[in-house]
Amino acid sequence: MKKLTSLFPLLFLIPLLASCAEEKQVYIVYFGEHKGDKAFHEIEEHHHSYLQSVKESEEDARASLLYSYKHSINGFAAELTPDQASKLEKLAEVVSVFKSHPRKYEAHTTRSWEFVGLEEEETDSDVPRRKNDADDRFRVGRNFLKKAKHGDGIIVGVLDSGVWPESKSFNDKGMGPVPKSWKGICQTGVAFNSSHCNRKIIGARYYVKGYERYYGAFNATANKDFLSPRDPDGHGSHTASTAVGRRVLGASALGGFAKGSASGGAPLARLAIYKACWAKPNAEKVEGNICLEEDMLAAIDDAIADGVHVISISIGTTEPFPFTQDGIAMGALHAVKRNIVVAASAGNSGPKPGTLSNLAPWIITVGASTLDRAFVGGLVLGNGYTIKTDSITAFKMDKFAPLVYASNVVVPGIALNETSQCLPNSLKPELVSGKVVLCLRGAGSRIGKGMEVKRAGGAGMILGNIAANGNEVPSDSHFVPTAGVTPTVVDKILEYIKTDKNPKAFIKPGKTVYKYQAAPSMTGFSSRGPNVVDPNILKPDITAPGLYILAAWSGADSPSKMSVDQRVAGYNIYSGTSMSCPHVAGAIALLKAIHPKWSSAAIRSALMTTAWMTNDKKKPIQDTTGLPANPFALGSGHFRPTKAADPGLVYDASYRAYLLYGCSVNITNIDPTFKCPSKIPPGYNHNYPSIAVPNLKKTVTVKRTVTNVGTGNSTSTYLFSVKPPSGISVKAIPNILSFNRIGQKQRFKIVIKPLKNQVMNATEKGQYQFGWFSWTDKVHVVRSPIAVSLA
């Protein structure tokens, strides 16, 4: 009995010990808008009071605080236990509490601006045209850029991995004084001082508190990074120069690929750098960056206060989150309230449906499409079989070499399902030396496979897609001559190796080829709709070039992003929606310069309703299947900045309109001055330039309002036309809109109903059907996509 009694104190302590041992993590406590006009110290003390309510002492509360967001965003980031976070979430004024995590966000990793019609002319005449000028439909010459003053006066904030300030893309030669509206700073740090800012890079900051809380005090050796705004990676410099880089003659990637003039979309716009992404500690840079939510929110809060006009974010969540659990979404809403336009990448998880990032209707979500430029090499087998391949490898073969399949030349002990993958230390040098190796994609990085072939003494590599990769063949700066091939070609090569006694191969070097293929087409990697957070909002919004984009690079990183690679390049070719997003950000800067009073929603509308749905061959833009791409792939289409400057009509939306929309997705208490109505309008009635109606059972009436922004004669009449989704009736009431002044608004309804005589099979039920409608006068075509699924 005595022994049993002695256990009671221990039993009593177990829950207490468990509570003490409960792991602390970083949470963001979000309050929405600030109430009243409080000083910064008052706001921080208010945040401390909430922390103290769940902490054991004032010292503990202050030590746990990482950030107090004081400018536009009202909230804080702090170390909390799950129990403490749960208690805070129940308190008054708290909108949401959400956990940060290193794997919650990821970065979404020239000819491009010439292709869309924004190249800077070298002379005062548009003729003679240069050999590789883009099709007239994608070309505009000087007038549009001159009207926009090349973006001068507009400040673009880029939230990424920093900047390499020595790049020619960021020189300030001939630029005027820094805009008086600028309120930011040039934050100094390792290898970065105030002299690295200039009249081009007018501000730079870095945010590392969240990163250090997870990984410990910053260690330059382990982190392979700079504790400053300097970019160790290349991703940030690439995106920044794509948006607003200066024109640089004779730029090219390693090996001379894509040689020509490199320029951002708005080359005279000013650049503000917000470094919130950091190299993974003790890892190769090719594995990507870490972008912590609490650091990004601090960056957005500062960007708003600094006075940027545009924010470009080539980062997104790795899985969908409700808007109030997504720091980028919430930060962007506060930016939009200040009429800052936010463009963000759609993600690189395509072509699987429902994989999009950055789904909030106040964000311009950008997918990735192709250019008309390719890097074409060749593969010749000993039996005469020849095929063109994609290649940006600078290395060359002098003659045919024996050809082997990786599975036949591995060391003992490699797992059966990995023998074909050319993983590190898997190949047997005595069987590989001097030979071309067929390696298959799957596990391991593409660059790493080439490294392994080189380590084993191989003469070259054929990198074969597996079925899951489809027919989209990537190009990388490999360490050996390399040819990328499709699954069909892989089968032919394997058959040749199997049946020929002395198989051999020759890899031809790649070269830059223009007008190689119909463009644009959709990339396979670009994430696809539908919008899984709110299917009433059609996403993505638009698409822009994101494949094989040439732009500035970091002097601290090789083109392959591997530490053993000592090659250095001032410019690099990179792919991803990370690359398409800054294209749109650059276009936004130009539109802001021409129309400084336009709202963020008006600029989105102008870009979307003027986008192309056809390629340079005047055929529908294709998906990777070879079929016409639908709005879940390309949104409203491929962007046309010059047309967007004069869209005719726009679908505008105020900050309060976004708050009203928020009521439909259970965001009810962000702004203390706004209350949701008793009857909440459905999400599809938000005044968006596209329409999505999921699970249609009966007639649905969608409401929209357009504003006349036409130039010249203010009197105009627009007629309605429609191509309805299959099995759906779409009508407009009224079907004629007349305007007699600029700024005039007109309301209309779109009546959508299923056709009674439409017989659906089982596969059609629940599947989306697509169409479009437009308003047309004698000058403008204002086009909107439609996506409807039948219940």
Curated annotation (Swiss-Prot):
It is found in: Secreted. Its main location: secreted. SUPFAM superfamilies: Subtilisin-like (SSF52743). Residues 134-645 form the Peptidase S8 domain. Residues 400-494 form the PA domain. GO terms for cellular component: extracellular region. InterPro entries: PA_domain, Peptidase_S8/S53_dom, Peptidase_S8/S53_dom_sf, Peptidase_S8_Ser-AS, Peptidase_S8_subtilisin-rel, Peptidases_S8_3, S8pro/Inhibitor_I9, S8pro/Inhibitor_I9_sf. Glycans are attached at N193, N219, N417, N666, N713, N761. GO terms for molecular function: serine-type endopeptidase activity. Residues 1-20 form the signal peptide. It is an enzyme of class 3 (hydrolase). The keyword Ligase does not apply. Residues 26-104 form the Inhibitor I9 domain. It holds the Pfam family Inhibitor_I9. Keywords: Autocatalytic cleavage, Glycoprotein, Hydrolase, Protease, Secreted, Serine protease, Signal, Zymogen. Its EC number is 3.4.21.-. The active site is at D160, H235, S578. Residues 21-108 form a propeptide. One of its GO terms (biological process) is proteolysis. PANTHER family: PROPROTEIN CONVERTASE SUBTILISIN/KEXIN. Belongs to the peptidase S8 family. This is Subtilisin-like protease SBT5.6. It comes from Arabidopsis thaliana (Mouse-ear cress).
